[in-house]
Amino acid sequence: MISIPKDEFQQIFVKDLMISSEKVAHVQIGNGLEHALLVLVKSGYSAIPVLDPMYKLHGLISTAMILDGMLGLERIEFERLDEMKVEQVMKEDIPVLKLEDSFAKALEMTIDHPFICAVNEDGYFEGILTRRAILKLLNKKVRQHNR
């Protein structure tokens, strides 16, 4: 049985583990789907945040959402890439963490999501917390206590 003292995690917050916004690919409201698809493909991410010009978080967009938006009744309508905007296909109802949220809350949320967007108290995008960052910290703590 693995046992790690609870206090090991009480002073760890989302802001301590997240990747800052400057290092995260994103698109803005008003961008076309073609631009969003290019950013997704070039970055290698499966989904990216959608921000307004002031960096407020509005949702996520993924390659699957873009492809779904291009589906017609009988074919993929590639011309929709030029016609449609990010906000027409993005997902607005997404899980979000605050900078001061606890490690425990972050751990619970990353069970179902590969990453969670982190925002400040006003809803402005600050970065992402990845499942990888959570697992790295857990692995480190387990190794420390199993010596």
Regions found by a protein language model. Name each.
Residues M1-R147:
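Tandem CBS (Cystathionine beta-synthase) repeat/Bateman regulatory domains
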